[in-house]
Amino acid sequence: MRNRPLLSVCLIILCVLTSCTLVGKERFIKELRPSPLEICTTEDESVIVCGVIYRQEQKENGQMIYLKHNSVYSISNKQKFQESKIIVYINSKEKLHIGNRIKVRGTVSFYENARNPGNFDQKFYYQKQGIHGKIYGSQMQITDKSVDVFREKLAVFRAGWKELLVREMGEREGGVLAAILLGEKSDMDPEMKELYQVNGIGHILAISGLHLSFAGLGAYRLFRRLTGSYKAGGLAGGMLLFLYVSMIGMTVSVLRAWVMFLFRVGADVTGRKYDMPTALSVAAVIAVGSNPLYLYDGGFLLSFGALLAICTVIPLVKEESQQPVLVRILGPGIAMNCVLWPVILYFFFEVPLYSVMLNLLVIPLMPVILSCGMAGSLVRMAGGTYGTWILMVCSRILKLYDGCCVLLLKFPVARWIAGRPEKWRCIVYYLMLSGIILIWKYMDRQPVKIRKKYMASLALYITAWLILISGPLLRRGMEVTMLDIGQGDCICVQGPKHQNYLIDGGSSDVKEIGKYRIEPFLKSRGIAQLDYVFLSHGDMDHMNGIEELLMRQDVGVRIRNLVVPGKQYWDERILKIITMAKMYGTDVKEMEYGTELKEGEMKFTCLGPGGNTDDKSHNVTTGNESSMILHLEYGEFDMLFTGDVEKEGEEMLTEVLDVIREEKKITWEILKTAHHGSKNSTTETFLQTVYPQYAWISAGRKNRYGHPHDLTLKRLEKSGAKIYSTQDNGAVAVTVRKKTMWIHGGNS
């Protein structure tokens, strides 16, 4: 530190910035404060926006236009104000250019925070970019045809380069190489992207120091040799790198690599030694100083964390000379993973256990991909047919990556889903890891002390690791979470003996509900396997997410058993999902009236369909009226899950509940309100029998059915039940331990 004054200063500045960010929040970070658009307008309000285009993307149904320097006019309150950045979605094929000023008439919409634990936080993602709202445009007019020639030319060149790669290599491999070379992931095959991520090689899709080394250091060294001048080489490399960075965009990893490149070249030009820790600290100060929200960004933490591992931990591993060959090969990769594990688990909830070995193949071949990709593209742009052959090398390597990823997922324990650790566990982990680094760095190298060093380090690391991952393992009691999945139903039950259950899972207004809402929630809770998935009936808003989960078991969550109502209540959709479950290795079980499923003190009992005393069940058809009804008991806690039951089905259920209440003197703490709060369900007679303390309603915001219905809400209020709705609360959860229970937001 005494020989690195700039490093010391940067660390102090980082500590100050971090403290201000954590304590000051919106007082210190302007991006967290409401923007004029949020203050002056409301959701779906009509406005007229006039702004300058700084970026645009072509979508299947129109264009996505990024505007800056915006003037916004609210039509309803006749108010005009300024907004720094806005995104416009419009179904128009009109040719636009960067720098054009356009006027758009449309409706305002705001980004949402994550509605469930583990879900993508769209609002925070755009806040980091200084964007607080979007406009769905109906009319558009170009008011100024001025063009930012420099950025427009780069955008056209980038788009043309991407088209060339896709044309020459095909959509799958071409899309991957476009992501690697250009940072363009919007049209990349989602399955390919996910395959890389779950295998621990998603980092190759991020523009990093390796890319800038080829673009910048390659040119720098070439021109330095040609001219014999460090300054000329540095200037040429810097100019080429500036063009490349301007084309791909200044992401946080690009910013880090750009600053470190300047330090590298600057050290050569001035005849000084390049110091990676100092360059890294300066890059961190610039990044956090320009946008403090990077401190909460997974990309920032992974990018800088990987370089921090290279500076601190990996040198300690390499300096031990008397090591087995396998340790020397795998040691650096394992050491880096040890540094990054808390970040990986916090943002992705799982660790690919074979990633170290896979990266031994992937990383050495990356220079080949970059050099052949850039060279082949340039030759092909110049009209040379040899460019196609050069690009074929990249295609073969990417197919090798693909095959290895698919193969490794078939290996036992390929992925370890540990869940999202609490922040305090991450802090303790890093404090103990720092202790290990100090032990290795400063303990004397006498043989006896070396053995003590190994033992102390191992004991300390095992303790740190157990603290990091033990959250889900130490969970006590039972927890029930009603997920917000829009217009649909999905409830997760985590039992006292660590078995996991899902009751329904589907939505009629949210696409890919299994992949983007249910699965991330399960993984964030450390749920790698669902022991039982109950399907109440065959409506798609209760089952399409379950179908996704069944198909995604290789990269998602395993499902042991699918539980369906008795055969007499099956329809075509239930038959279809049963066939699908068997095809993907999931057992199928029927649950008839009176069937019980126990886990310790917790018990599920099926109360329908088919439980009436007058044998009316023969008149009940498939569908809502024959929904599976479940009674959950845990100690003195009782909860009723009613699916979409209504009409005759609810009448029969009321008769059953009357008998149970008289025999067992049961009161239900929570009722999962049937059919999303439809007026045809949850009658006064039914509520007089159940008399719940709390009523949970799962319904989509602004749904076309008007759920929950006002009459249903009035009946619930009249019964004395306190209402929790996913529309208002997002995910809702209840935790039960012994004789205590508390309801809280699912994100808490």
Tell me the role of every PLM-derived stretch.
Residues 73-74, 92-107, 124-126, 131, ...:
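Non-globular, low-confidence helical/coil segments that flank catalytic cores
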Residues 9, 189-356, 372, 419-475, ...:
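Hydrophobic alpha-helical transmembrane segments in multi-pass membrane proteins
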Residues 128-260, 265, 338, 532, ...:
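Aromatic-rich juxtamembrane segments at the membrane interface
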Residues 15, 21-203, 515-520, 529, ...:
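Membrane-interface helix/helix-cap signal primarily in integral membrane proteins
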Residues 150-169, 176, 184, 192, ...:
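Hydrophobic alpha-helical segments of integral membrane proteins
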Residues 1-21:
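Start-transfer (signal-anchor) and selected internal transmembrane alpha helices
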